């Protein structure tokens, strides 16, 4: 099991603080300003989490694979409806390529890194750590799905009444190889 160093621990505290401050800001202060800052905040999280990993070949490989795998899944998904269901992205997440905000790749990297790191701290066998990491990613997806359309991040076809069950199943399946790579390589 890897231990958190002080810098990583501080980085996670900063990220959680921004999340709490952002939620409070959206609920009680200038909602639109906080929503507009979402892409910038996600990019900041990315750099906070990878601040000391640019010389680690395995971590850079993980970053590139995760970004590419996540963007590819989203491009196929949003343009065909085959992977996650019928959905589209709004304007909140910023610049889009092939109908997918570029920041979605960063979201896949950040959530994969955080969930994999948490799971890797638990003293259980590798397959259980992978299961925990994928489950944490799935929990994040379940929590964000009802909020995303309200802040124009993405929305599913209105006839489906929200995210279909297949979205959650395939989200876990897309996350599985990422978490397997992360846990097996002890990143």
List the model feature ranges, each with a label.
Residues 1-187:
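Aromatic-rich, lipid-facing transmembrane alpha helices and their immediate juxtamembrane interface loops
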């Amino acid at each position: 099991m890897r231990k958190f160093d002080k810098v990583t621990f501080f980085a996670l505290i900063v990220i959680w603080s921004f999340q709490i401050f952002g939620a409070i800001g959206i609920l009680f202060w200038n909602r639109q300003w906080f929503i507009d800052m979402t892409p910038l905040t996600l990019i900041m999280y990315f750099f906070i989490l990878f601040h000391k990993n640019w010389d680690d070949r395995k971590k850079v490989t993980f970053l590139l694979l995760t970004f590419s795998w996540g963007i590819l899944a989203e491009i196929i998904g949003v343009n065909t409806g085959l992977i996650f269901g019928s959905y589209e992205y709004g304007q909140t997440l910023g610049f889009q390529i092939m109908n997918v905000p570029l920041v979605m790749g960063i979201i896949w990297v950040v959530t994969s890194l955080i969930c994999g790191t948490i799971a890797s701290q638990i003293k259980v066998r590798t397959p259980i750590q992978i299961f925990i990491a994928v489950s944490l990613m799935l929990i994040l997806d379940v929590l964000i799905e009802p909020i995303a359309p309200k802040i124009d991040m993405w929305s599913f076809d209105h006839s489906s009444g929200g995210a279909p069950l297949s979205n959650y199943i395939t989200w876990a399946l897309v996350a599985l190889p990422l978490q397997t790579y992360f846990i097996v390589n002890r990143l």
